[in-house]
């Protein structure tokens, strides 16, 4: 195992919050493999780059010699995690959960080492609780404590219903940590309440409390909201290489650095050198290409990454797209015809519709087929004719 100082530095890279750091240091000094847990409810079958921020950290713990468990919340998925929701989340059927879980396992092994990953389902112990066990578990917390959760607080203040079973969710997730005697649990910053519940339940059941390590939420292609399928601002890890390349190249130059910190495996010193190069005048597009190729090679292959870059060059560089062009921000749902007019590429929407019909309007080098088409969140190069360009961000 790596030295404690070196291991701690790697573990803390990109971490939003570590509760508490001194307890993690103490656990590392014990010189034994720590029990590391990451839980996920298989509510959707596709994993995107936002999910990989935490999986990358889990992979690091594997490389450092610790015991990693990917916990599939098949039981809790049937309850429905209320985190971040202003309405009750509909529970999934057992069939949906198991089908999604199989897809999850296939995808996470693109990141985690299968030989070093233990897969568990929390139904193993939660199904055994029974009515008496559920009542005993519920007795560990009060309604007042549950209403400290931001989402519950807002719903209660707004007169929105909160189902009793939703109060159980943090307790059930916390009980996972008791059942597994977890040393460290990973999660996103939106899971803080649930993660701390695990610490509380472990303390009350005579266990050493787990360390909570929270990773930031990856901002999506729009540069504003967290990456999610529902927001349409995501990059799926199973997407075609050319699709991934184009999406990564569409992010803003500022957002690129966040992606480097959270998604790249390059040394921090190298990333800092990239920043210095850009400040010295290097085109940030060249740095973004390196990021795109690194990510594509990870989930596909280096050959696929090279091919995706070449396709991108063929589509865009040969069209002689200028580096400098007007930039605009527009709301999602705006049709192409309106975007072309409001960005000054066409004098009117009628002209914009005519340009589309004539095949003279392009988005990211592709001819627009429908003037009513509204692009999803992201940053795109719009072109009319050979010389009119605008970089438009859809939010």
From Swiss-Prot:
<keyword id="KW-0694">RNA-binding</keyword>
<dbReference type="InterPro" id="IPR002307">
    <property type="entry name" value="Tyr-tRNA-ligase"/>
</dbReference>
<dbReference type="GO" id="GO:0003723">
    <property type="term" value="F:RNA binding"/>
</dbReference>
<keyword id="KW-0963">Cytoplasm</keyword>
<dbReference type="GO" id="GO:0005829">
    <property type="term" value="C:cytosol"/>
</dbReference>
<keyword id="KW-0648">Protein biosynthesis</keyword>
<dbReference type="InterPro" id="IPR014729">
    <property type="entry name" value="Rossmann-like_a/b/a_fold"/>
</dbReference>
<comment type="function">
    <text>Catalyzes the attachment of tyrosine to tRNA(Tyr) in a two-step reaction: tyrosine is first activated by ATP to form Tyr-AMP and then transferred to the acceptor end of tRNA(Tyr).</text>
</comment>
<dbReference type="InterPro" id="IPR024108">
    <property type="entry name" value="Tyr-tRNA-ligase_bac_2"/>
</dbReference>
<dbReference type="GO" id="GO:0006437">
    <property type="term" value="P:tyrosyl-tRNA aminoacylation"/>
</dbReference>
<dbReference type="InterPro" id="IPR001412">
    <property type="entry name" value="aa-tRNA-synth_I_CS"/>
</dbReference>
<keyword id="KW-0547">Nucleotide-binding</keyword>
<feature type="binding site">
    <location>
        <position position="229"/>
    </location>
    <ligand>
        <name>ATP</name>
    </ligand>
</feature>
<dbReference type="InterPro" id="IPR024088">
    <property type="entry name" value="Tyr-tRNA-ligase_bac-type"/>
</dbReference>
<dbReference type="GO" id="GO:0005524">
    <property type="term" value="F:ATP binding"/>
</dbReference>
<dbReference type="InterPro" id="IPR036986">
    <property type="entry name" value="S4_RNA-bd_sf"/>
</dbReference>
<feature type="short sequence motif" description="'KMSKS' region">
    <location>
        <begin position="226"/>
        <end position="230"/>
    </location>
</feature>
<comment type="similarity">
    <text>Belongs to the class-I aminoacyl-tRNA synthetase family. TyrS type 2 subfamily.</text>
</comment>
<protein>
    <recommendedName>
        <fullName>Tyrosine--tRNA ligase 2</fullName>
        <ecNumber>6.1.1.1</ecNumber>
    </recommendedName>
</protein>
<dbReference type="Pfam" id="PF00579">
    <property type="entry name" value="tRNA-synt_1b"/>
</dbReference>
<feature type="short sequence motif" description="'HIGH' region">
    <location>
        <begin position="42"/>
        <end position="51"/>
    </location>
</feature>
<dbReference type="GO" id="GO:0004831">
    <property type="term" value="F:tyrosine-tRNA ligase activity"/>
</dbReference>
<keyword id="KW-0030">Aminoacyl-tRNA synthetase</keyword>
<keyword id="KW-0067">ATP-binding</keyword>
<keyword id="KW-0436">Ligase</keyword>
<comment type="subunit">
    <text>Homodimer.</text>
</comment>
<dbReference type="InterPro" id="IPR002305">
    <property type="entry name" value="aa-tRNA-synth_Ic"/>
</dbReference>
<feature type="domain" description="S4 RNA-binding">
    <location>
        <begin position="334"/>
        <end position="394"/>
    </location>
</feature>
């Amino acid at each position: 195992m790596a030295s404690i100082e070196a291991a701690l530095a790697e573990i803390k890279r990109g971490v939003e919050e570590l509760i508490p750091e001194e307890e993690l240091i103490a656990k590392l000094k014990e010189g034994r493999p720590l029990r590391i847990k990451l839980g996920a409810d298989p509510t959707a079958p596709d994993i995107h780059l936002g999910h990989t921020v935490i999986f990358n950290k889990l992979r690091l713990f594997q490389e450092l010699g610790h015991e990693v468990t990917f916990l599939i919340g098949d039981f809790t998925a049937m309850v429905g995690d209320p985190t971040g929701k202003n309405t009750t989340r509909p529970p999934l059927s057992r069939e949906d959960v198991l089908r999604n879980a199989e897809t999850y396992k296939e995808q996470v092994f693109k990141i985690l080492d299968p030989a070093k990953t233990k897969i568990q389902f929390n139904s193993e112990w939660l199904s055994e609780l029974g009515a008496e066990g559920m009542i005993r578990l519920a007795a560990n917390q009060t309604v007042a404590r549950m209403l400290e959760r931001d989402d519950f607080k807002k719903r209660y203040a707004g007169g929105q219903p909160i189902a009793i079973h939703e109060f159980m969710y943090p307790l059930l997730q916390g009980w996972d940590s008791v059942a597994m005697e977890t040393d460290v649990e990973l999660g996103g910053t939106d899971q803080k309440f649930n993660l701390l519940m695990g610490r509380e339940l472990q303390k009350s059941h005579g266990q050493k409390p787990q360390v909570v390590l929270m990773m930031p939420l990856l901002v999506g292609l729009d540069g504003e909201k967290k990456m999610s399928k529902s927001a349409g601002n995501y990059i799926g890890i199973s997407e075609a290489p050319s699709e991934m390349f184009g999406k990564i190249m569409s992010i803003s130059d500022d957002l690129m650095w966040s992606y480097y910190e959270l998604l790249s495996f390059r040394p921090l010193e190298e990333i800092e050198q990239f920043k210095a190069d850009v400040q010295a005048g290097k085109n940030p597009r060249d740095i973004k290409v390196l990021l795109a190729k690194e990510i594509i090679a990870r989930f596909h292959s280096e050959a696929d990454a090279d091919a995706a870059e070449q396709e991108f060059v063929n589509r865009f560089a040969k069209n002689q797209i200028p580096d400098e062009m007007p930039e605009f921000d527009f709301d999602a749902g705006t049709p192409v015809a309106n975007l072309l007019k409001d960005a000054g590429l066409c004098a009117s929407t009628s002209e914009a519709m005519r340009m589309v019909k004539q095949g003279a309007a392009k988005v990211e080098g592709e001819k627009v087929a429908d003037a009513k088409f509204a692009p999803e969140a992201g940053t795109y190069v719009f072109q009319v004719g050979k010389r009119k360009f605008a970089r438009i961000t859809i939010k």
